[in-house]
A protein has these predicted regions:
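Alpha-helical transmembrane segments of multi-pass membrane proteins
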Residues: 96-109, 135-152, 181-183, 420-433, ...
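Hydrophobic transmembrane alpha-helices of multi-pass small-molecule transporters
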Residues: 1-66, 70-72, 204, 209, ...
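Generic detector of multi-pass transmembrane helix bundles and their immediately adjacent loops
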Residues: 408-413, 420-494, 498-513, 517-522
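Membrane-embedded alpha-helical segments and adjacent helix-loop junctions characteristic
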Residues: 33, 40, 47-134, 194-207, ...
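Re-entrant/interfacial helical elements at transmembrane boundaries that shape
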Residues: 38-39, 83-85, 117-130, 142-146, ...
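Transmembrane alpha-helix interface/packing and boundary motifs in multi-pass membrane proteins
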Residues: 20-29, 106-115, 147-157, 345-351, ...
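Hydrophobic alpha-helical transmembrane segments
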Residues: 10-15, 32-37, 63, 97-105, ...
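Juxtamembrane and boundary regions of transmembrane helices in multi-pass small-molecule transporters
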Residues: 133-143, 153-232, 296-314, 470-525
């Protein structure tokens, strides 16, 4: 340790940065492992104390983001997102441009409320169904869905972790935090520009391609089960806000083997009904003796289906926990809307710190029974949390060691006395490239200290630099690996790696131009 502590702190910080970027780009190690490795490396090289190296895990930003994952889960699991999507898209008709306009605006608003990934995951099945009804290949609608969601993340403070991070950096630089709705000043123009480009140009820049891997559509799934099991029940009676169905397969060595069942019987616990049974391609009639491999169609309350699907001896074909997400305004939806509304009021008024508002909402959702404790833990993207917590110390090291000042001085000497606009443009080009290769969250945590140093050297406000940084970090459009949302739509639409940049490049240019020329008008240097 004594030898390591004599390593030049600036050199150590820059070497750790380069190694981290290489690890991120190579994709050979989990993101969380890389982030933790960064924090530990900063400690072992003596750049940071142990408290500083681990401070990210107790940072209010990390707690705020973790709580927002629970809020997002509640909106998704109770069918609020599905309900909103169905109501809006049902009025859009089947014209391609109208669909793109409606889908783009809808996902932008939803992503501002529940995150980019949550919005795309919630609306993806619905958009595929709409594409089928409009006789359009999903490839014409799904990439616009992901890209419009990224634009929508700039509408509110809670739209993406990046927004929260740049706001915290602003406070750390001695300036005010960005307001909850303040991001809309740049977010609204970005959403409008993005949706217009998607509406009028995506047809020529996207492939006409189908994919065999399609997401679940609840009503189509229910109709398929009704047909396969020769049921006389109406589809609307199979699934609803309170009750649903799930198909389970009897596993080998299941305790159910040898028992007798018949259609219409209730299970021994009294909370589920056996609607029908199949053995191979044949629908079984009357009383049967259960064998391994038999398929049973069970109906009951969603909570009961979820509980029994996890029991030993049966294998659910589709998880009822996932199926219930596609029920509009399911159990707990009203409570969720009230709690989320209260959180938005707290965030907008600033009555309590953002992390406190989100934690209060998350606790209220758990205590009111909307989200179960295991479900709350499972909803949190621990990769994202660990990534941010592990990379925050790198930002601290950049500032503490003077590495940020060194890089800032190098950039400024490279461009000469060209003023803040050129400095901003150069910094944003670096950000744009990095955000296509590694997480945009990690990119911002790396670049933000450099942005603050450049602003301080030029004697200008850091706010336009930080807001512009958030804008360009959201422009992760050129590769499928740039964001999880880009990857989500890849298989259902049949996209290939080279499909993304064709539509992504015009959007990236739009975001870059807005960041360089429009942002400083709203947040002056």
């Amino acid at each position: 340790m004594a030898t390591l502590s004599r390593v030049d702190p600036v050199v150590a910080t820059l070497v750790i940065l380069v190694l981290a970027i290489v690890a991120f780009v190579s994709n050979r190690l989990p993101l969380g492992i890389v982030a933790i490795g960064v924090a530990l490396a900063l400690y072992f090289t003596g750049v940071l104390t142990l408290t500083e190296a681990l401070a990210g895990f107790g940072d209010p930003t990390v707690l705020f983001i973790a709580a927002l994952f629970v809020v997002s889960e509640a909106l998704d699991a109770t069918g609020v997102t599905t309900w909103a999507g169905q109501k809006v898209i049902a009025r859009a008709g089947t014209k391609r441009r109208t669909l793109l306009l409606v889908i783009g605006l809808l996902v932008a608003v939803v992503s501002a409320l529940i995150s980019v990934n949550g919005a795309v995951a919630a609306l993806l099945p619905l958009v595929v169904v709409v594409a089928t009804r409009a006789s359009l290949p999903p490839s014409q609608l799904l990439m616009p869905l992901a890209f419009a969601a990224s634009a929508g993340s700039m509408l509110l403070l809670t739209g993406t972790p990046v927004n929260i991070i740049v706001s915290e950096f602003a406070v750390g630089a001695g300036e005010r935090a960005f307001g909850y709705f303040e991001f809309a000043l740049v977010g609204i123009p970005l959403v409008i520009g993005t949706v217009l480009i998607l509406t009028f140009f995506s047809r020529f820049l996207l492939p006409q391609r189908e994919s065999a891997q399609m997401p679940i559509d609840l009503m189509r799934h229910a109709r398929m089960l009704r047909r396969q099991y020769s049921l006389s029940l109406e589809t609307s009676l199979l699934v609803g806000p309170a009750n649903g169905v799930t198909e389970v397969v009897v596993a080998p060595r299941s305790p159910l083997i040898g028992s007798k069942v018949f259609p219409g019987m209730t299970t021994p616990t009294g909370d589920l009904v056996v609607l029908a049974a199949r053995r191979g391609d044949a629908v079984l009639k009357g009383e049967i003796v259960v064998q391994a491999g038999d398929a049973l169609l069970m109906q009951g309350r969603w909570d009961d289906l979820v509980r029994h699907a996890d029991e030993e001896g049966v294998l659910p074909v589709h998880s009822p926990q996932e199926l219930r997400r596609f029920v509009p305004l399911g159990r707990g939806a009203k409570r969720t809307l009230v709690i989320v509304g209260a959180m938005v009021v707290l965030l907008a008024t600033g009555l309590v710190p953002p992390a406190v508002a989100a934690l209060l909402a998350a606790c209220a959702l758990v205590l009111s029974g909307v989200v179960k404790v295991p479900q709350a833990y499972g909803s949190i993207s621990w990769t994202t949390i660990v990534l941010i917590a592990g990379m925050i110390p790198l930002s601290t090291a950049f500032t503490k060691t003077g590495a940020a000042d060194l890089i800032a001085d190098g950039l400024l000497s490279l461009i000469g006395d060209q003023g803040p606009y050129v400095a901003l443009a150069v910094l944003l080009l670096l950000t744009l490239v990095l955000s296509q290769l590694i997480s945009n969250t990690a990119t911002v945590l790396i670049v933000a200290p450099i942005a603050l140093s450049i602003a301080a050297t030029l004697g200008v406000s850091a706010q336009p630099f930080l807001m512009a940084l958030a804008v360009v970090a959201a422009a992760a459009f050129l590769t499928p690996v740039a964001t999880p949302a880009n990857l989500m739509v890849m298989d259902p639409a049949g996209y290939q790696f080279g499909d993304y940049w064709k539509l992504g490049l015009p959007l990236a240019i739009l975001f870059l131009l807005v960041a360089v020329f429009y942002v400083p008008l709203v947040w002056p240097f």
